[in-house]
A protein has these predicted regions:
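Sec-dependent signal peptide recognition
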Residues: 3-15
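Hydrophobic residues at beta-strand termini and immediately following loops
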Residues: 125
């Protein structure tokens, strides 16, 4: 009876140790495992894939593609435009989820890319609608600036002082 009990105890402890090893998870940051945002009316959990053996989707794995269009881009896209990293983006998504109406997160990928995935909690405004050099209609661009961003046109210039972040 003692051996049976001891073997059972060892088995249970090994299960608990294994469960504990998996429970630690693959966090986003040391103090951030995940966040929940609302996307198109549904709650979405943002977290890293918990499988440490996971590989990048082959559709995103190419490292050598013709430039243009697949050119390396600067981290600072234009003067006055703030560049942020993934953790800062998650902070903005959390603020938006908590009701901060000054935050607007835009996924600027084109529709064919958005079909493959998007930023949960964002709205899609393709970069082609935001860039005059890509053929964006100036009137549609002005409408986006005013209605989506909250910018104010003043004597031919745009005032972003009260625009969404």
């Amino acid at each position: 009876m003692g051996d049976f009990f001891m073997n059972g105890l060892i088995f249970i402890l090994s299960l608990l140790w294994t469960a504990g090893a998996f429970a630690s998870g693959v966090n986003i940051a040391p103090d951030l495992a995940s966040i929940v945002v609302t996307h198109q009316g549904a709650k979405v959990l943002i977290e890293r894939n918990q499988n440490p053996e996971n590989l990048v989707n082959p559709a995103y794995a190419k490292t050598s593609r013709e430039c243009p269009p697949f050119c390396i881009q600067p981290i600072k896209i234009a003067p006055g435009v703030e560049s942020i990293g993934e953790l800062e983006l998650l902070d903005y998504l959390k603020a938006k989820e908590q009701g901060d109406s000054s935050v607007l997160v835009i996924d600027s990928r084109t529709p064919n890319w958005v079909e493959r995935g998007t930023i949960p909690g964002s709205i899609n405004i393709p970069w082609t609608k935001l860039s005059p050099s890509a053929g964006a209609d100036p009137f549609e661009l002005a409408e986006i600036f005013a209605q989506r961003f909250g910018a104010i046109e003043q004597e031919g210039f745009w005032n972003y002082a009260e625009a969404k972040t």
